[in-house]
């Protein structure tokens, strides 16, 4: 089984697209996506913190269709977890 952080990174890299309007307007920034993985391993977005709606919308879209995971375990029992995931949007020439 792939560790959670590595799986998450791979998912984001695979699904990341810089919004065209943000490129045209030269908008860059960082967005924090507050994720919750419940006891069944289902991911949901609790909050998105950023300074630009275009980047926030893209950060949310990245997680569309995210597959069900194995839940986190504490003392052998499934538990809910919260995880803050930063996404940096930087235009490269």
Predicted features along the sequence, with ranges:
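Residue-level recognition of short loop/turn positions
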Residues: 38-40, 75
């Amino acid at each position: 089984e792939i560790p959670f952080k590595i799986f998450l990174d791979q998912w984001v890299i695979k699904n990341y697209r810089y919004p065209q309007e943000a490129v045209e307007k030269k908008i860059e920034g960082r967005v924090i996506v507050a994720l919750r993985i419940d006891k069944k391993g289902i991911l949901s977005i609790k909050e998105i913190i950023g300074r630009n709606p275009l980047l926030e919308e893209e950060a949310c879209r990245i997680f569309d269709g995210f597959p069900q995971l194995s839940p986190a375990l504490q003392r052998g029992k499934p538990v809910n977890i919260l995880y803050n995931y930063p996404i940096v949007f930087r235009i490269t020439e």
